[in-house]
Amino acid sequence: MKNIKKPYVILNAAMTIDGKISSKEGDSEISDEEDWKEVHKLRTQVDAIIVGKNTILKDNPKLHIKFYEHNGYYRIIIDSKLSIPIDSQVITYKPETYPTIICATENVLQEKVQEFEARNVKVIKNGKSSSVDLKKLMLNLYNLGIRSVLLEGGGNLNWSF
């Protein structure tokens, strides 16, 4: 087997029997408490969790671990234009335990990068078009020592991998 320099990716997605991940109204609460405990257990077993910017904009999650002992992990946000609010919980909640990395395109304004870096957020810039180059990103993450990631969507991001 050849040495592949990218993290192992695990997809976690709750969906209905007909393959939907949210209702027409956008409600994505499909999971029950037992499901959430399993998600948090999975989070204890990876080096990073990846979500897209829409998850942050819609839910403002902490992306932390409850129910289990752990050492923390990286929170990785795919946000080509650095458009999430600087005061999002993913940035402000326990950054020493859950450091945040935002992946943007090379076109993003340096002032925006500096704004996030001032909050101890690492910004990785790759992708010359309007979207982040996910193949390059995987190599970037591997080079940071990240060997496993839990992909928690949303839908567009899930299908991009």
Where are the language model's segments positioned?
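Active-site ligand-binding patch in enzyme domains
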Residues: 2-144, 156-159
